From Swiss-Prot:
The lineage of its organism: Bacteria, Bacillati, Bacillota, Bacilli, Bacillales. GO terms for molecular function: ADP binding; ATP binding; phosphotransferase activity, phosphate group as acceptor; protein serine/threonine kinase activity. Disulfide bonds: none annotated. It catalyses: N(tele)-phospho-L-histidyl/L-threonyl-[pyruvate, phosphate dikinase] + ADP = N(tele)-phospho-L-histidyl/O-phospho-L-threonyl-[pyruvate, phosphate dikinase] + AMP + H(+); N(tele)-phospho-L-histidyl/O-phospho-L-threonyl-[pyruvate, phosphate dikinase] + phosphate + H(+) = N(tele)-phospho-L-histidyl/L-threonyl-[pyruvate, phosphate dikinase] + diphosphate. It comes from Bacillus licheniformis (strain ATCC 14580 / DSM 13 / JCM 2505 / CCUG 7422 / NBRC 12200 / NCIMB 9375 / NCTC 10341 / NRRL NRS-1264 / Gibson 46). This is Putative pyruvate, phosphate dikinase regulatory protein. ADP binds at residues 151-158. It is an enzyme of class 2 (transferase). InterPro entries: Kinase-pyrophosphorylase, PPDK_reg. Its EC number is 2.7.11.32, 2.7.4.27.
Length: 270
């Protein structure tokens, strides 16, 4: 391919059209260095279309476009043909084919692919919430959360929080340590929102030893000591008993399995 300009015209951002053009260009050796892509977004008037056609006519460029408003699309096609400018309609024929095959009527509204729905924003918000209120960083998150996970170290609190966040649930998690008093919010929040993550001493002992090894540390450290683990789990049992919340045994469960159990529990509650 010799040096040429491809004009990407869109009534929205033009990202979709540019990606298609780049995919096509990639099929030609060395073409990415020889081809200039010029994106013209948010085209809604005939004047802009005439300007682009004049540019393409002058330098022998190609116009690739995603224009969903029929009048604007038809105008570009008509003007390009008058000027003998090569054009390619990326989305129009597909919309028309889908209307013909499925019997649906298109909305013909620019930018719909970027009109992110409420569901998407809820997911993003939940993920940000999980990060902000991870590992008991801010106890205020306990009262704002849909779910509060509590458990000793290495009971998958953080990955569970993130997994559930992708289901649009705001999750805070709180570590339970005998030497640290749990935040008072744990005892004022609705117990039905709290889930205790239970684990067997032997399983936790194995997990912690593997964790220490992965960090290059001695697996005989107090962190993986079975007596210390039993002490932590006894303290955990006292806390969940005081809260009066449900408990899920995570001993031999994958994160996905535990998350689905918790999700189902919350769904039934609602």
């Amino acid at each position: 391919m010799s040096n040429r300009t491809i004009y990407v015209v869109s009534d929205s951002v033009g990202e979709t059209a540019e990606l298609v053009v780049k995919a096509a260009i990639s099929q030609f050796n060395g073409s990415s260095e020889q081809t200039n892509i010029r994106r013209i977004p948010y085209v809604e008037d005939r004047g802009t279309i005439k300007e682009v056609i004049s540019l393409a006519e002058a330098d022998g460029g190609i116009i690739c476009f995603t224009l969903v408003v029929p009048e604007i699309r038809e105008f570009l096609i008509a003007e390009a043909e008058k000027a003998n400018v090569v054009y390619y309609d990326i989305i129009g024929p597909l919309i028309e084919k889908m209307e013909s095959v499925y019997g649906f009527s298109a909305k013909y509204e620019p930018g719909r692919v970027r009109q992110l729905d409420e569901d998407y924003f809820k997911k993003v918000e939940a993920i940000e919430f999980a990060v902000k209120y991870d590992d008991g960083r801010d106890p205020r998150g306990i009262l704002k959360a849909d779910i509060v996970l509590i458990g000793v170290s290495r009971t998958s609190k953080t990955p569970l929080s993130q997994y559930l966040a992708h289901k649009r649930l705001k999750v805070a998690n709180v570590p339970i340590v005998p030497e640290v008093d749990p935040p008072e919010e744990l005892f004022t929040v609705d117990p039905a929102k709290c889930i205790g993550l239970k684990i067997s001493p032997d399983k936790l002992n194995h997990i912690r030893k593997e964790r220490l090894k992965s960090l290059g540390l001695n697996d005989k450290a107090i962190y993986a000591n079975i007596n210390r683990i039993k002490e932590e789990l006894e303290f955990f049992e006292k806390i969940v008993g005081r809260i009066g919340c449900n408990v899920v045994d995570v001993s031999n469960k994958a994160v996905e399995e535990t998350a689905n159990i918790i999700h189902n529990m919350m769904t039934k509650r609602v």
